[in-house]
Amino acid sequence: EVAQNEPALRAEKSRYAVTFREYLTDDCRLVLANLRDAVASGAQVANYLSVDGLLGENQAEGVTAQCALTGRSIQVKAAVVVNATGPWVDATRQLEADVEPRLVLSRGIHVAVRRTDLPVNNLVTMTGSDGRPVFALPRGPVTYLGTTDTRHLEPATHHPSVEQIDVDFLLTTVEDHFDISLTPKQVTGAWAGLRPLISKPEQTTSELSRKDEVWVGPRGVVTVAGGKLTGYLQMADDVLESVDTQLSAQQSLNSSAVFSGTTSTSKTLPGGDIASDLSLAAQTLAADHDLALPIAERLVRRYGSETEAVITLGKEPVAPGAHLLSGEIVWAVQVDGALFLDDVLVRRTGSMWFDPEVGVLIEPVAEQLAGLLGWTSEQTSEQISLLERQQETDLTFI
């Protein structure tokens, strides 16, 4: 049965199989959906705004922050401040007091190759030479591989480098498990991220627990660190319990007033209320709008029950033969808050990572964004150059 489902696997390496669903997630769109839901519930959300200080003396009473777009500084008053800054948790804690670091940063990379070069039909789990698990996952026209686990000794950054040694580790692992040999030149997309792990003496990054921890600092800042994306709802509940304790101690509000009616486990996020299964929804969408089935499947998986609204904004491809539709660009700006070219092609649509033909998308998408956001020709050219340089940096190992 394994051989029938995954004929490219080495039979001697894969005698058994299980179904594993944890990785059926688009992390960027999951974050966006949570932000949109928060706004709908009354939250104020600000992007490109970095915190650089705390208000108050003995107790944190808010933050000072600077807008990365205008340079303007603002103050935000708050009864409780939460530090949920991921790899920047320790740097943010330094705003509260001179404290010892509690994090170890682990760098993980992914690489994507054409699905024709590594044909898999399901999530395939492999074991690397050091015993670490490596996954191969099909996504549209590509199969992507990940991840690695390497201690990151430099300060946290939004764009960690994709190192040659990590790429070689992933490609070698594939060769050990498939009758396929991949080279770096076959990689069409690559990216790296940082895991903020709670430090434990004498443990390597792969040995460190992924469990989250919540604690309160000397000025009352609630900090959360560690954890995994799949456990974010429970992490949020843990943070809110700590916030509730802080508020109750201040005699500002009681718990029933603060969190009445909020149940994270039963909440449906925007786009999540699909009545039928995804395959049927995609088939219906393709028939109703004369779309190729692969495009319809991608749209339904990306936008869920909001797919019809996206198509209404434009169902023509952004370039001849492209799978990305013009309505997706409008949606990215008007609904998902995109401001720059990389916002759209990296975080909102994932095209930079998961579309081997992304090169033909860059200029037409930039031109469409220029019309939506009022860019000058110079600003448009700058956005194109920035994205192309980032792509070149990510693929330096080729």
Each model region followed by its residue ranges:
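Flavin-dependent oxidoreductases
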Residues: 56-59, 67-137
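A structural signal for short hydrophobic beta-strand segments in well-ordered beta-sheet cores
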Residues: 51-54, 135-136, 214
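Helical element adjacent to the flavin cofactor pocket in flavoenzyme catalytic cores
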Residues: 18-80, 236
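C-terminal accessory subdomains/tails of enzymes that are appended
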Residues: 1-12, 19-28, 40-41, 85-87, ...
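Glycine-centered loop/turn positions within well-structured domains
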Residues: 16, 52, 61, 90, ...
